[in-house]
Amino acid sequence: MNQLYQRSFLRLMDFSMNEIMYILRLSHFLKQQKSNHTETQKLHKKNIVLIFENHSTRTRCAFEVAAFDQGARVTCLTPNISQIGHKESIKDTAKILGRMYHGIQYRGYNQDTINIFAQYSNVPVWNGLTEQFHPTQMLADLMTMQEQVPHKSFCKIKLAYVGDARNNIGNSLLEAASIIGFDLRLVSPREFWPQQELLTTCRKLTKLNKVNILLTENIQEGVKDVDFLYTDVWVSMGENEKVWTHRISLLSPYQVNQDMINYTGNSNVKFLHCLPALHNNETTIGKKIAHKHNLFNGLEVTNEIFESKHSIVFDQAENRLHTIKALMISTLLPNLYHKNITFHTKN
């Protein structure tokens, strides 16, 4: 029996450690099947709708290709072609889409919006990103960690996230570590630490699961001996540029560069980033920030590190496809995908 059938995935805490590990096992299996051209379509005649309130490259492509690989049909709704939240309420939209589609992906701003979709659609809803959480990214991150250090269980893995730890990646990593059990260091100015409510919830889990989570402003302490260094962008489009200036001034010491790599003491440390990354001035926004703040070798990460042997960001991005495929299969099929991939607690 598939215990994830008809379940929504709005944040990582919606699933147990056992359930997340099942999705990861299925992800590895599906990746191998795709590579071997032996994949079996299990989502034939399923209809999936992808809702985007903001721009997307990796999330949209991963959901679309995953659905197509599995034989599902996809509709994509963007703000310029839908009435969601403008002429039609979220609640009403959820009710009608739930009658037409087997699953809904939502990528937008407010976590409350996706919660309404899940409450009223009566079909699985998957969080492609909100300002609060990015759980589908976490599945790809966990899979990538397993691939890079296959000799280590999660409880032996150390990861440092540096920069803005209050964003959706920082929040989701906090949940991931609390559930899965890897050693997490959030290395950030105190102003950018996660909200106290989330910290309190996760600390209860860490005590239960005997997990080590460190919040520190001290870079050398935070990154010492880690297996993975992770960061995310510091600025977002649409924000006031005064906000950018304030953030950059506080976060500039937390740039992932060669000095930080050296501080880890691990010559094989791997670099993670959910992308897009401002690692050079080849983009419009990168060029603007470089000239205004005199940062010509990247913002949150230098181009040297982004292009180095340490960087596994494109493996990480590819794994969005395999984990999203596993998530859709797990929540849309009443039975297990393969008899040899079952629910158990080993990590």
Curated annotation (Swiss-Prot):
Carbamoyl phosphate binds at residues 56-59, 83, 107, 134-137, 274-275, 320. GO terms for biological process: arginine biosynthetic process via ornithine; arginine catabolic process to ornithine; citrulline biosynthetic process. One of its GO terms (cellular component) is cytoplasm. Its EC number is 2.1.3.3. It is found in: Cytoplasm. It catalyses: carbamoyl phosphate + L-ornithine = L-citrulline + phosphate + H(+). GO terms for molecular function: amino acid binding; ornithine carbamoyltransferase activity. HAMAP family: OTCase. PANTHER family: ORNITHINE CARBAMOYLTRANSFERASE SUBUNIT F-RELATED, ORNITHINE CARBAMOYLTRANSFERASE, MITOCHONDRIAL. Belongs to the aspartate/ornithine carbamoyltransferase superfamily. OTCase family. This is Ornithine carbamoyltransferase. It comes from Blochmanniella floridana.
